[in-house]
């Protein structure tokens, strides 16, 4: 008998990488086409099979469908992104761990060091940006496929998830309060659901039982 995780390591890795990109930069014309593509629909359908993710996925599907009804959808999404993630007023949802008092200062640097990673010089945002956490989780899930690193990477994955969950709920709540059209609010809710779902998997190894 083969016991497998509800989502494979590679599937987690791809989803985290996709979410990292969406929270890092504005959706351009090409990105908008991809959001509305059959490929993304298939990915969301895969996630929707998990009961813990179904409601969040359904909400995001609704918001993606609603984009076709928004005039100048790409420009409107760009404005939403700017207002939420680039402004510093009280109606924003800044994607930096240091903006939330629950987070230990400099934690992401320690996590990256343990993973043997560093922030690329081309990355112009602070190192504690949400996208860095998600790229780290993507890397760790891919690394879980290498058996000689599995125990160490799984432990580091748990530390990263725990660190992220210290401030991600408040970030998500800010998105809900300040995103009038709801795409990024729905995206943040899905992210929070995935991180919590991932955090519930103590051991992502594949175990074969005779």
Curated annotation (Swiss-Prot):
Entry superkingdom: Bacteria
Subcellular localization: Cytoplasm
One GO location term (cellular component): cytoplasm
GO biological process, any: protein folding
UniProt cross-references to SUPFAM superfamilies, sorted A to Z: TorD-like
Keyword Transmembrane helix: no
Keyword Chaperone among record annotations: yes
UniProt xrefs under Pfam families: Nitrate_red_del
This protein's UniProt keywords: Chaperone, Cytoplasm
Entry's family note: Belongs to the TorD/DmsD family. TorD subfamily.
Protein function: Involved in the biogenesis of TorA. Acts on TorA before the insertion of the molybdenum cofactor and, as a result, probably favors a conformation of the apoenzyme that is competent for acquiring the cofactor.
Protein name per the record: Chaperone protein TorD
Species whose genome carries this gene: Salmonella dublin (strain CT_02021853)
């Amino acid at each position: 008998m083969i016991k497998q995780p509800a989502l494979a390591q590679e599937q987690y890795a791809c989803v985290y990488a996709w979410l990292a990109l969406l929270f890092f930069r504005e959706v351009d014309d090409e990105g908008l086409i991809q959001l509305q593509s059959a490929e993304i629909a298939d990915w969301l359908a895969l996630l929707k099979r998990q009961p813990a993710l179904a409601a969040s996925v359904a909400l995001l599907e609704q918001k993606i469908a609603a984009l076709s009804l928004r005039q100048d959808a790409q420009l409107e999404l760009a404005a939403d992104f700017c207002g939420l993630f680039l402004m510093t007023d009280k109606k924003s949802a800044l994607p930096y761990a240091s903006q939330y008092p629950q987070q230990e200062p400099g934690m992401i640097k320690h996590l990256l060091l343990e993973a043997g990673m560093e922030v690329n010089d081309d990355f112009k945002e602070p190192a504690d940006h949400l996208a860095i956490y998600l790229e780290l989780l993507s890397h760790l899930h891919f690394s879980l496929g290498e058996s000689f690193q599995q125990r160490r990477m799984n432990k580091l994955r748990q530390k990263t998830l725990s660190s992220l969950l210290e401030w991600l709920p408040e970030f998500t709540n800010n998105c809900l309060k300040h995103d009038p059209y709801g795409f990024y609010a729905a995206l943040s809710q899905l992210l929070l659901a995935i991180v919590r779902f991932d955090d519930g998997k103590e051991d992502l190894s594949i175990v074969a039982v005779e």
